[in-house]
């Protein structure tokens, strides 16, 4: 899975992402440079409906640990073939809301007509 393909899959799901590097690690105050950072959430998408937030770090998709963009791409490709799956995120404290942080699980369900 290339980084470009993983990023494209993320956009189809409804998020603009990048691999957590040293710069993102420092900005978000993370212990390790692991996971995939959510840089933007696209309105009207599955990701927005699941409540995924900007500045969160995706740590797992459907119980598959995410450390790299390749992990993210493979796990998201498998998960979106199903109707329902979960996305585990770590949401660092926002400077304006130091209480609102922690690990969250987002349920992603398919839309039915």
Locate each region found by the language model:
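C-terminal recognition in membrane/secretory proteostasis and scaffolding
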Residues: 1-113
């Amino acid at each position: 899975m290339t980084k470009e393909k993983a990023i494209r899959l993320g956009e189809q799901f409804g998020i603009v992402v990048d691999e957590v590097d040293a710069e993102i690690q420092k900005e978000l105050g993370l212990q390790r440079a692991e996971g995939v950072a959510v840089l933007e959430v696209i309105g009207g998408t599955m990701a927005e409906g699941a409540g995924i937030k900007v500045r969160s770090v995706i740590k797992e998709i459907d119980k598959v640990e995410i450390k790299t963009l390749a992990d993210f791409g493979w796990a998201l490709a498998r998960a979106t073939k199903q109707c329902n799956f979960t996305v585990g995120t770590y949401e660092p404290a926002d400077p304006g809301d130091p209480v609102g942080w922690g690990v969250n699980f987002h349920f992603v369900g398919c839309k039915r007509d």
